[in-house]
């Protein structure tokens, strides 16, 4: 994994979908420009709740406010992807979204979760593959989108640049 160095606050977009796609393209382009003949994947995620996009929280208190408001409710996780073939220069991008339904957490559960620091590193202050997973009642759509790499979208974008997902397999894992 290579950190792109893209300033995520330097993007003005009309909506959450456009925002994550623009950021994914900028991240992929920044890495591809210095990566040579590799397939580069840029990603960005935002959680839209009550019509407002939420990236990573800026403070534990902000994370607490968000997670408290989400109790027993749902929102949409958007993840933008951009793939670039470093050999051909071909590029494809797109966005996947999944609805996330939250359970009703107790204050003690939120306190314990926030004490781990995990909330500060993820869009919307939660993740499906970490300590907050038990607080999620379900998802409508692709779970891998919530984790940050929508595998169906990734495969589709690779096909658009004439790269088979199987070409990226390394070794024989059988």
Each model region followed by its residue ranges:
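A short beta-strand-loop structural module common to alpha/beta enzyme folds
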Residues: 1-9
């Amino acid at each position: 994994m290579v950190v792109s160095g893209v300033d995520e606050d330097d993007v003005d977009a009309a909506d959450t979908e456009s925002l994550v796609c623009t950021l994914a393209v900028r991240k992929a382009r920044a890495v591809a420009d210095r990566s040579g003949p590799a397939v580069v994947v840029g990603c960005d995620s935002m959680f839209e709740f009550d019509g407002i996009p939420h990236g990573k929280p800026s403070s534990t208190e902000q994370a607490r406010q968000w997670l408290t408001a989400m109790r027993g409710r749902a929102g949409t996780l958007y993840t933008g992807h951009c793939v670039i073939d470093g050999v051909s220069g071909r590029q494809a991008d797109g966005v996947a979204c999944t609805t996330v339904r939250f359970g009703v957490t107790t204050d003690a559960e939120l306190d314990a979760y926030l004490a781990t620091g995990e909330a500060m590193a993820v869009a919307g202050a939660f993740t499906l593959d970490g300590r907050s997973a038990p607080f999620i009642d379900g998802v409508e759509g692709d779970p891998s989108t919530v984790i940050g790499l929508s595998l169906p979208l990734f495969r589709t974008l690779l096909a658009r640049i004439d790269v088979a997902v199987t070409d990226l397999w390394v070794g024989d894992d059988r």
